[in-house]
Amino acid sequence: MVEIIGERVGEVVGSPQLQQIVLVEIPTAGGSRERVRAEFSAVVAGGAGQALRPGDAVIVVKSPPPDQTYFVADRDRSRPLAFIAAVFVALAVLLGRLRGVTSLVGLGITVVVLAEFVVPGILSGASPLLVSVLGALVIAVASIYLAHGFSRRTSIAVASTLITLTLSAFLAAAAVSVARLFGSGTEEAFYLQLGLLKQVNLRGLLLGGIILGAVGVLDDITTGQAAAVDEIHKANPALPVRELYQRGRSVGTEHITSLVNTLFLAYAGASLPLFILFTINTYQPLWVTLSSEFVAEEIVRTLVGSIALILAVPITTQMAAYVLGRGVGQVRP
């Protein structure tokens, strides 16, 4: 954006709205740059500086004929996002070294699985739940082995993740069915039912989202729990399986209390505006708000993920105690 030609603050549905006429510079087909007038509007919220300033990178859209006017759709945030991503990659490599590199490769595989398998599979009319579960299994296996290497305790974490993920799929299906959720609680779900995408199974899509969301937290707790039991076993190889399990459970209890709270805060942070609306809503009782499709979906998502975390601890601990305590899979001289 080059210059502000004019601006004013109007009112739309009782809310102040900023309206600006600005001069922007856009590239042309011949490689040169052209200056055009464009309109920009934004709701003035919380005193935030949403007004455009000279030097801002913006996304300009041209309306179709016969008007062919220009308007600013949004700010171009590609450069700051690329910078933040570069900092993330640099820190992962600098602090994680080889494991940091392999974890980034695992992240890349996750993106590829989602973009090339899960999304196309859902768009082709396949069951969103089945596609998401298969994608989650591939993501779990690839990301855990790449991030933590090939070892007995990593294989224990992978097996525990797959078992817990399968149980979570059944649990999510039961919870969605009992709560009578249909996956239509968000604006995005509404748009998916329009046009060519109306064949998408929204309930299956909701279930698939719950499963994919559980993979990341399961990865964390199963690898950490398997590592804890392994270290206890190395410190005292003479411990019987039962004692190894009990000591591992003691560590797992700490994992549960911290990660359940972490999972809740992750959802709460993403839905902070919704929490604020709860506090100022005086038109209907709280139980009515909680029963709405959108809120109930988030509650089920959080609770299923938390239950998956809780189940992962005894499953991983029992498997690790048995395999490590009895020397299953150990190469003997």
Predicted regions and their residues:
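Helical hairpin unit composed of two closely spaced alpha helices linked by a short loop
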Residues: V215-T223, V229-F278, T282-Y283
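Transmembrane alpha-helical segments that form the functional core of multipass membrane systems
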Residues: V87-Q193, V200-G213
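Pore-lining and gate-forming transmembrane alpha-helices of multi-pass membrane transport proteins
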Residues: S160-T164, G195-L212, S258, T262, ...
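Structural detector for short beta-strands of small beta-barrel domains
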Residues: M1-L18
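Short, surface-exposed secondary-structure boundary micro-motifs
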Residues: P27-A29, S63
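Extended, hydrophilic extramembrane loops/domains of integral membrane proteins
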Residues: V43-R79
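Hydrophobic alpha-helical transmembrane segments of membrane transport and translocation systems
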Residues: A268, L272-P333
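Juxtamembrane helix-loop transition segments at the membrane interface in multi-pass membrane proteins
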Residues: G149-A159, V178-F190, G224-N236, W287, ...
